[in-house]
Amino acid sequence: YAPLLEKMNELRHAREFRLLKMLEKLHNLGYEIEVEACDPNNRAVGRPHVAKALVAKGYFETVQDVFYALLHRGGPAYVPQPKLAPNEAVDLIHKAGGIAVLAHPSELSDGNLPEYLVSNFAFDGIEVYHPSADEADQEKWLALAKKYNILVSGGSDFHGIPDRFPTELGIFEV
C-alpha cells in the first residue's frame, strides 16, 4: 500500500535526522560518537543504539546509566521521536489491510488514555501481555478489550539490549 510505504519512508528520514540531532547534542556535551558506532546495519537507529555505543566507548557502565544521565525524556541529549497521530496510524493500517493494535498501553503516562484511544480511534486490538504490564494492568486491558469487543495481543518487546528485560528472546512468555 503506497501511502503507508510513503509515510514509513518519511518517518525513517525523520528518525535519521533525530539521530544526527542526538549525536550533535552529545558532541556538545563532550561525548564523541559517530553514526556508524550506533549500529551500521540498522536502518532504524534509536536511543538504545546510541546508549549501547556510549557504553562500548567506555563513557558509561550500562545502557540504563546512559538513559538516566542523558537520553531520558527531557534529558540533555534527548530529541523527541517523530510520531503519527493515532487516527492517521489506524487509518493507514486499515487501508493497507492490517489490524491496528494499541501497543504498550501500560507505558502511557495517563491511565485513562488507553480507553480514550480505543474508544475514539477504531483500534482492532490492545496489547494486554507485555513486560510493562503487571497483573493489575493485564486485568484492566482485558476488561477494556471485552468492553469494546477488540482483539487481545501480547509481545515480549525484545530488542536485544543488554541489561533491559527481557534480556533474551523467550524469557518473557505471552
Regions inferred by a protein language model and the residue ranges of each:
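Extended substrate/RNA-proximal surfaces in nucleic-acid metabolism proteins
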Residues: 1-116
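Charged catalytic cores and adjacent phosphate/nucleic-acid-binding surfaces used
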Residues: 8-11, 58-61, 84-102, 106-174
